[in-house]
């Protein structure tokens, strides 16, 4: 399974739209695709029309050793999804005390490599522990930017210096 994280610490740059488009496009091409909604805004989960009431969500995978990715997978028209959760905004503090705080997502996703061709991770607008979990789990990163002076002269170079 190839895992691609779509991340940028800025909001409004199209991370969710790009994540959904890539996941749905790969699914239409016959690829087994998993979308992981790490954004507490849950836009990908809502667009996939997934009800998360009493369901395992990405928050559970980030903060508990009791669940694996298989426990949270739901099907939608664009493939499969691990739904987001508004509680992801609390995950940073919940994860901070864990020794494995940077590998919780990667650890939870072990065992599904043979089930999918691609996993697409929609990241929140931050570079905190949640996004860093996505980066650790990912084989590739896509950093969408709005092609303006601020993004190209400041945000892209600063992100590259920090994680490059």
Language-model segments: residues:
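P-loop NTP-binding core
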Residues: 1-164
């Amino acid at each position: 399974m190839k895992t691609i994280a779509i991340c940028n610490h800025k909001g409004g740059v199209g991370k969710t739209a790009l994540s959904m488009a890539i996941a749905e496009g790969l699914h239409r091409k016959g690829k087994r695709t998993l979308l992981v909604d790490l954004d507490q805004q849950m836009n990908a989960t809502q667009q996939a029309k997934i009800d998360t009431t009493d369901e395992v969500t990405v928050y559970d995978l980030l903060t508990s050793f009791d669940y694996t990715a298989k426990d949270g997978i739901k099907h939608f028209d664009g493939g499969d999804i691990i739904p987001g959760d508004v509680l992801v905004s609390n995950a940073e503090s919940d994860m901070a005390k864990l020794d494995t705080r940077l590998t919780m997502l990667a650890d939870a996703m072990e065992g599904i490599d043979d089930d999918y061709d691609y996993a697409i991770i929609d990241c929140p607008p931050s570079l905190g522990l949640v996004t860093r979990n996505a980066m650790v789990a990912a084989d590739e990163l896509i950093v969408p930017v709005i092609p303006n002076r601020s993004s190209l002269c400041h945000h892209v170079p600063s992100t590259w210096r920090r994680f490059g």
